Amino acid sequence: TPEIAMRIQRTLGSNIQMVLDECTHYPASKDEALLSMKRSEQWALRSFESYQDLKQDSDSAIFGIIQGGMYGDLRLENLDYLSSINFDGLAIGGLSVGETINERMEVLEQLMPAMPKSMPRYLMGLGTPLDIISAVDVGVDMFDCVIQTRHARNGQIYTHRGVLRIKNAQYKDDLRPIDEDCNCYSCNNFSRSYIRHLFNCNEILGSRLATIHNISFYLGLMANIREAITTNSFEK
């Protein structure tokens, strides 16, 4: 229930607490998306009321989650409803669930101009570096995704020159770091050849080193995006 969800987040000490919502499946008819959205609206209000009851002196924040499937009018209707509740920020849910990039961007391009500029705007469940850059370009501020760790466990490593699949035979004798433009712990201390060896031996250190690098790469990506926005050079 929304009340249990908020109580768990309060117990965990979550800095940003999310309302309980229903992620609309894809593809969904408009009637299905509307029914799911209305359920999420009811849960959003109950979550907010429970959060207020539990908040006490906590420094936490609560975000609403915008649903509505791939239907721009439903998204805007849901945004209007959530904006009437005193949330600290708004998240965009129900994307990165199997839709095409064009469908996703169409939803974002309809939704983002209507979102309050005074609130953080958080896109849930995205994504690749290109996905993130495209979403920032239309006004998204925050992201979360498991791709950095999930892909690392499978030997897919992000670099400034594209994805490196470390298990491939071409890296057997490659003594270079994963990414010569990276200063993370993995790149400073281990070669591609050694990390490939760890993966081939099913040694957990391999996935840990790949994870450290992928997370470092994404932190650097976001830092570069922030700097580009600050210096008015993002479009370059």
What are these regions (language model features)?
Residues 40-47, 82, 108-111, 218, ...:
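Hydrophobic alpha-helical packing residues
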Residues 21-27, 179-236:
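C-terminal extensions of enzymes
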Residues 7, 130-133, 141, 193, ...:
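Active-site phosphate/pyrophosphate-handling residues
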Residues 35, 42, 73, 102, ...:
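Conserved active-site and cofactor/substrate-binding residues in soluble primary-metabolism enzymes
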Residues 54-178:
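Glycine-rich phosphate/ribose-binding loops and adjacent secondary-structure elements
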Residues 1-87, 97:
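Active-site entrance/lid segments in N-terminal catalytic domains of soluble metabolic enzymes
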